[in-house]
Regions:
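Alpha-helical promoter-recognition and RNA polymerase-docking modules of transcription initiation factors
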Residues: 2-108
Length: 108
C-alpha cells in the first residue's frame, strides 16, 4: 500500500470549528451500492488507498450525524466525531463487501 499519497481529508480544527467541518464534509457524495462494492473490492484486492479514501469520505456525514445524537452526554462533539472517523477507517480496513452488506451497516 502506498503511504506517500497526499490526503486531502477534512479535519476538525480550532480555526473553523465544527460548523466549518460540517460544511466541508457535505461536499463528499454518498455512494451507490454498486460503486461502494467496487471501491471496497478494489481496496481489498489491490490496496488502492484512493478507493479506501473515497469509502471513508462518503461516510463522514454519517459519523457526524451519529456523534451529534450523543450531544449532552458530557463529551465534546468534535472528539466524538474524531473517534468515530478512526472507527470508520478501521471498519473500511476490515470490511468484506462480498458478504452483501453496506459499509454503513458493517461499521455500526
Amino acid at each position: 500500500m502506498n503511504s506517500t499519497i497526499n490526503h486531502n481529508l477534512p479535519a476538525l480544527s480550532n480555526e473553523g470549528g465544527l460548523s466549518a467541518y460540517l460544511e466541508q464534509i457535505k461536499k463528499f457524495p454518498m455512494l451507490a451500492a454498486e460503486e461502494e462494492y467496487m471501491l471496497a473490492k478494489n481496496w481489498k484486492t489491490t490496496g488502492n488507498v484512493k478507493a479506501a479514501e473515497k469509502l471513508v469520505t462518503s461516510h463522514l456525514r454519517l459519523v457526524a450525524k451519529i456523534a451529534m445524537g450523543y450531544r449532552g452526554y458530557g463529551l465534546p462533539v468534535n472528539e466524538m466525531i474524531s473517534e468515530g472517523n478512526v472507527g470508520l477507517m478501521q471498519a473500511v480496513k476490515k470490511f468484506e463487501p462480498e458478504k452483501g452488506f453496506r459499509l454503513a451497516t458493517y461499521a455500526m
